Amino acid sequence: MAADTFRISRRRALSLAGVSAAAGVGAGVAAGRSAPDASAVPADPAALKYPFYGEHQAGITTPAQDRLHFAVFDVDDIPREELISLLQDWTIAAARMSQGGSAGEFAPDAGPYEAPPEDTGEAMDLGPTGLTITFGFGPTLFTAADGTDRFGIADRRPRALVDLPRFSGDMLDERISGGDLCIQACADDPQVAVHAIRNLSRIAFGRASLRYSQLGFGRTSSTSTAQVTPRNLFGFKDGTANLKAEDPAAVDEHVWVADSDDQAWMAGGSYLVSRKIRMNIEPWDRTRLSEQERAIGRTKGHGAPLSGGDEFTAPDFSMPGSGGKPIIAEQAHVRLAHPDTNGGARMLRRGYNFVDGNDDLGRLNAGLFFLCFQRDPERSFIPVQTRLAGSDLLNEYTRHVGSAIFAVPGGAAEGSYVGARLFES
Amino acid sequence: MITARLPKPAVVAAACGILFVTACTPNASAETAAGGTGELSVTSTAEDCSVSAATAESGPLTFTIRNAGDQVTEFYLLAEDGLRIVSEVENIGPGISRNLVVNATPGSYYTVCKPGMVGDGVGRAAFTVTDSGTAVEPAGDEQAQIDAALTNYKAYVKDQVDQLLTGTEDFAAAYVAGNDDEARRLYPTTRMHFERVEPVAESFGDLDPKLDNREADLAEGEEWTGWHRIEKDLWPPADAGYVPLTQAEREAVAAQLVEDTTTLHSSIQGIELSLDQLANGAIGLMDEVANGKVTGEEEIWSGTDLWDFQGNVEGARVLADGLRNLLESRDPELAATLDADFTSLSAELDKHRTSAPDAAQRDIAYVSYGDLASEDVKALSDRVNALSEPLSRITAALLG
């Protein structure tokens, strides 16, 4: 059954890819197997669209868009059937919107005149602008804090969907942590991403409600070799060593859950860890350049490792510098986060910068909304973050204030819905 | 107003001939080719050290050194005797460019690169600085001033840690004896000694977390020791089901605190400090204020953040004052700005001081952080930012 679904979905994805490619759009990404044709510049960037249905959900290996609206929901005390119907409704609306359509059956200016419009309308005329909508399930959807099996799926909770441990220095705010369901909406136009979350939230009323949501701008990772590495709010290039869609073997090994992994319903899916990392912007800005580069382990300009070369030169962690100390400091971020330091652990990072205005002290409330996808957090995020939390030189300038983990199921076949296999016997 | 406070380039670089010149690299990414006045490019390879020109006019010179070799390299500007280092830049990785800014007086020099960071270097070449007619400030007797600053600061650190140890012993004794009122009086006033020299204490990597970890700093399963563990026991949370420490637990955590403080005390006896550490210590202390004290996150149980705040500011002021003579000759404007900003921050803090100005150390008192209005905290934060910006420029002003 599952194999059939995937065969169909992959054919479907390929046919959609053909359509998209005609419009100059990088395609094949939804299937997660082939590289996006990034050399082709869309004639109209607003028309950029990615297939919604496929083996994998879009929005993971899709070339990272410029804007994010990430939303986390808590599910009301509803029967299992209503949870399923919510996922079905969300899937249909998300599929439509990702192709530039309305959230509902009718356009925002159509439908019964005495009824409120089904679609809120602010995305009219904007085009899909590369919108992807990605759904995930939090630990509390499977098992409530008191152990209750809320929807008869407790025995299907994947082993890899662990409760994240407490890391040194965590200053987590419960109000922006955890949650039952997540939706990651990414697009090149912020209003398109916001429109998606707004309409999906509206659809959920009575079944699930917003727990918290986060706007992001300025993607901080590139997920395709065709993308220039962007900068985070420390002013440094971020994500140079990220997993890229063009390396399907590495993506298969480190991102996608395999058929043989634990829970079969998660095959083709991934695990998402989100961390809201506040940056102590003002002290950082007062830090001398030499110290900034020492903390990161790369040059600020080109992003080359301090051991030399250019941005994509592999860091040489053993290279001695003056005074017999390594030229890349023992506690430099690049060293502690690097796969070589972490038994080869890798993940696909997909984070965004954020500025939530300012705090009461007149300081920018800004930082990195870190998102990463991986096959098993216990082999990727958790050991890496444990190492970083212990001694990263950057810790002086950051604090983790939000945290969550979600099981992101594989993509849906057309006619089905996201997460259907979780509920099938 | 930041630009108004930027030290003038000519003044900034004056120290390069004497001090730790690794910091003379204000712009690591600049790739400007030689050509403009005072701009020179250097290419360092395994065999050679080619400089774009063999002469330059006196005044500020910028060498842009590009490492075209495959080993880490260094670049030196040597004095006429070919031995004394006028200026240098270290740790240039292969393929990386870095700038060296130096304020050169007329005379004969040598340039040399040191790929691999060992040996006498390669490509040694004569370099002549002709008189541009514009006077370059002489360095004067700066080394004597630097030595005095280091000696004075080391004495200050020792004195503070002496008092910290004595105070900690008294605090621990009061706590173990169940004299909690006395312990609560000694807690913030003793910690001020630690806060005044915090960057030095933090330089002993293992000790700082044992002494000063907050509950939020702990990883899962990590043991909590030090000041803040006792703080929570002396100011227990009112609402939740906090379990007070038993007498045996009190004795253990107090003994550990005294033991770790004793270790800190003996560790600092032979401490060596550099001018670089002094200059950065001041801004480090103000970062401590910005990241923890002004937000009330340092002393969440006792609310005694303002004692720590005052300790950090006093420590920063001692550092800045110790460097004042040096700074005065380089950048009098910066020195004056710092004086004014320290004064206005202290005035803001004094508004919340409840003890007399001449109170003994153990009687110093402030209002609890929780009693500050949000506009009070904003005003303090604004003054911290106002002071920290010019303070962060001391290192560049002194070292290049």
Predicted features along the sequence, with ranges:
Chain A
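Long, histidine/aromatic-enriched segments associated with O2/redox biology
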Residues: 12-31, 39-425
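N-terminal secretory signal peptides
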Residues: 1-8
